[in-house]
Amino acid sequence: MSGYFVLKASGTQYMFNLHAGNHEIILTSERYTSKASAQDGIASVQKNAPDDARYQRLTAKDGSPYFSLTATNGQSIGRSEMYKTTQARDNGIASVKSNAPGAPTKDQTQA
């Protein structure tokens, strides 16, 4: 099973998650003020995910590794969860690279 995006609304804001084939969330977006902007964010993830240079490998204050996926303009378009090891973070990046391009979107904004 391949990955998929879930587009959600929360009040007047929109966001999306990228799920791996096992249904685990591997990337969470920023919040958007319009559905169209969130859909553009999904398209940007699909476009930028294969490019390793678009990933910032970061460490939280508590030492937990995580990553941020950035667009060509340098703006963050999604972040990972906090991982226990850098290897787990790198596996998360590999999962985004393989699951995001061409992933369908499940629109839950009408639910």
UniProtKB/Swiss-Prot annotation:
Record bears the keyword Disulfide bond: no
Sequence repeat placement: 9-57, 60-108
Keywords: Repeat
Signal peptide interval: none
SUPFAM superfamilies with a match to the protein in the record: YegP-like
Matches recorded under InterPro entries: DUF1508, UPF0339_domain, YegP-like_sf
Pfam families linked: DUF1508
Residues covered by region (Disordered): 86-111
Superkingdom in the source lineage: Bacteria
Family note: Belongs to the UPF0339 family. Duplicated subfamily.
PANTHER family (alphabetical): PTHR40606, UPF0339 PROTEIN YEGP
Protein name: UPF0339 protein BP0521
Species annotation: Bordetella pertussis (strain Tohama I / ATCC BAA-589 / NCTC 13251)
